[in-house]
Amino acid sequence: VLLLAQMSSRGNLLTPNYRDEVIAKGTTNDGVLGFIGNGARPEELGQLREKVGDGKLIWTPGVNLAVGDGEMGQRYGHPAEAVNAGSDCIIVGSGIHRASNPAEMAKKYSQVSWDALLERD
């Protein structure tokens, strides 16, 4: 089970109280493998990592090599910044499926995130 702790889209309904409750329940439950974090805000992702520790995974949407705002209110941060802030797995959508060569772009995301992981550890 992955719990939604943060969202990167503008205007989302998650409050700090919600986030704290999710983290409190998720860190004490062995059935929870990890949390969904905010890839658009590395500082928030780093705070999530501090709160959940190294025993839980953080999966991170909201990353794109083209940092900025999306068409439907989503915000994107750079995948390397997300990994350096504590993300264990980046979730990439439009950055790959809208590319002219999706396979090549997937390799690029893989390399960028792998390089960041090597820098982090």
Residue ranges and their predicted role:
Residues E81-G86, S94-D121:
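C-terminal helical cap(s) of enzyme catalytic domains, especially alpha/beta-barrels
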